């Protein structure tokens, strides 16, 4: 007999030394005794598509086979991987590590078991070994080829360019094209070849280890990274897909994520036959706990997905492997399953404690010609990449950050992201190539816990720019880098922003909410730097003038949303009638030009004020003359200002009459640059006049009459007061008009919300008492009707109207004693009565006062029976069905209660959603006050558990803080809605030891912000208090309110 030829092991093929006995067991533990008996040969397909045969005892548990594979590879972090195979019913399942192999793989000779990544951590820098990252990179390559990792063309080309750099080394066009012709990394690769080659040219000098690092940096930001879809249906029979990730359970429609249930919200997971059940924890103000139900293809499919969910929860959320429960002696009921293996925390601790030897290895593609690979050893590069990633100056913001929760970047529907978005700035790369190419720049957007930051869930249509040179090394930080897919998954090669990652204990939020919260790797401002900082004048007038400058910068950016971004998009799409174009853009462009010059004058004056010792003599320490000159110039633009209300009405009428224009405007609002509702930007010029008036009032109050600047300030104040008085009535009318149209986008099930004479009064969250107990509902109060709605599992994130109570003839009474529910009210209408409960006494009093006022107004009106709001045309309801809809159906309000077929993408972070998550309310009075309280400027930010301060450009508007890396950025990186937050000054026990610091906290979330002067500190406190106290401020009927109502 001839000798059997020895096949190379995976470890030797990769160039690893002989097996050093590395095990996935904790130190001090012994492996279970290997069962004796017949050996069975099992074929394992590795991530590089080669196959290896392993002989294991037939009765051995699955863990023996997985350990054998990991030992063969000398893989220390084997816990992230698993073995999957098709069972006897052709369902792909994971090998159970506790069950005997023979009971799982019935016919080993005919089955190929795949060694693949099972648990995808939120941050690739948590993978300590270069070999582990290499295997993850192979998994990404495989997912791209199989169509699992969907993304836009730019992202795909950038990913493939890093794969090519890892496989063949530095750029050579002929070699690149030859290699791409022989290797297909993605379907329709030919169309991307030029872009791949172009990106590859930017990676010169990048080693394979760095290429893997950058590949994972980009891939982890894509929404479909690590996602395995499991087909299911909701209760209505709508086809959806379920998936599980490190953050919780996700719901997709196609490749679009439409909902997420983070582990913190899930109380219990179970299945019953084909039904998969998620029992959610009850809200703080609701005794009723919701149970979501999904229907899967079979019991086996359902059980398989249930086991995957249990394993993900244990691996990412538990500190140690759960202990086995004793088996019942006589009877057992239902299925039981226990996670076996180390948790992620145990793996991280084991590797950090040095319980292993770092293994050098060679890759499958070893013949590469990278410049730096000739000069550096792989281990040195690896450690340097990690060190640089940990020192990254990328912006981060928050605790419990979560991955983007918007739509996936699927081909054909994603926005095109150009290489080189204007206004962005490069951030430090882990390494720089000899050519000195700049690193791809970035930003952040992401969604958190339901009471965390809200980040715009939208995409960006960037302006076309020439490609910027790039090393391709996106910031390899485990924190928020400067790059963004902003919950849409698309990654641009340069000057684009990517979303933040998750920490191991990160909690996912609803599609609305999202974060930027991580304390590590933030740029720091220490005391030494503070000592070298520029010293500003101490005069309060200087800081008032500086406020004009900082807010003017924001105002110009807001104008550019219309004059630049919206106009350029309109010209490309040709979706707007010429008459509407001529009404909007010619009335905004003169304002932008005028205020650009105005800002230059202010900044020149401030520069002289700051920098000259003889400024007092040369008459530079004043701003009144500049204000007076430019306000007089603004009076010549009054004709354009008068046209803005007409433009707003024309735009909304055009949207109502044209489906194409409606879709176009909705798509534009999903772009990152449009960080507020589009129609809000049309009212910005009117709001800006009030800000000038406030600033001048403060200057006049500050200066004594004898001051040289007093006369100019007083004259400018008189001029601007006259303009505000002329436009005040129009502004009040337009604010209500704009708010009605904004609410219309958040609601489904109504059609004629915007009618002449209807005034918005209050919106907010209340609990409605029904047969199932108290259930959270969203209420909308107008001057003629009260609507109540619920938010379902919809792709659009809108609220469905379930009831309408005309205010005419309504009575309201407190009924705490009758129902035994705190802060309870009974609303008795002529056709229907409902019982509701507020979250607090103050919240109940505000609702009572506003509803009673609205009832009184309705009684005085000449229309005792206002027309009910009609159902929207898409609902296609008959009159009988419409009447039935008024009586709320409990089945209709269940988890998967609405069809997902015809829902359009919708912003999920509006004020309605914030009130829903924070369980509070806001009134039109609050909105009017918020218009007057807008502020911009630099602040230093610190977390409660950190020592360093991070400098951010912060814009406060619309009850929300928007965070930018600098004032030159075109869109915010993240935002923090302030409703529900408390504003205080840190106590001595918090050991801040800095001046001008204020504290924002909500539940467990605490942020410290530091201003540069006493004046700016007081101003930030003033404007933020207007938002944080809006939920608790006693209701006072202002002059504005009386005009509105």
UniProtKB/Swiss-Prot annotation:
Residues in PH domain copies: 759-856, 932-1029
Compositionally biased tracts (Polar residues): 373-396, 471-489, 496-511
Expressing tissues: Detected in cAMP-treated chondrocytes, but not in untreated chondrocytes. Detected in fetal brain, heart and spleen, and in adult testis, kidney and lung.
Chief location of this protein within or outside the cell: membrane
Residues in DH domain copies: 540-730
Sites of Phosphothreonine modification: 24, 883
Region named Disordered: 1-37, 361-534, 864-903
One GO CC annotation: cytoskeleton
SUPFAM superfamilies: DBL homology domain (DH-domain), PH domain-like, Second domain of FERM, Ubiquitin-like
Alphabetical list of Pfam families matching this protein: FA, FERM_C, FERM_M, FERM_N, PH, RhoGEF
InterPro entries: Band_41_domain, DBL_dom_sf, DH_dom, Ez/rad/moesin-like, FA, FARP1/FARP2/FRMD7_FERM_C, FERM/acyl-CoA-bd_prot_sf, FERM_2
Induction of the gene: Up-regulated in response to cAMP in cultured embryonic chondrocytes.
Molecular function terms, GO-annotated: cytoskeletal protein binding; guanyl-nucleotide exchange factor activity; small GTPase binding
List of residues that carry Phosphoserine: 20, 23, 340, 373, 389, 403, 418, 427, 433, 510, 514, 833, 872, 878, 889, 896, 899
FERM domain: residues covered: 40-320
Cell compartments where the protein resides: Cell membrane; Synapse; Synapse, Synaptosome; Cytoplasm, Cytosol
Domain of life: Eukaryota
Record keywords: Cell membrane, Cell projection, Cytoplasm, Developmental protein, Guanine-nucleotide releasing factor, Membrane, Phosphoprotein, Repeat, Synapse, Synaptosome
Function: Functions as a guanine nucleotide exchange factor for RAC1. May play a role in semaphorin signaling. Plays a role in the assembly and disassembly of dendritic filopodia, the formation of dendritic spines, regulation of dendrite length and ultimately the formation of synapses.
Quaternary data: Interacts with CADM1. Interacts with RAC1.
Protein name per UniProt: FERM, ARHGEF and pleckstrin domain-containing protein 1
Organism: Homo sapiens (Human)
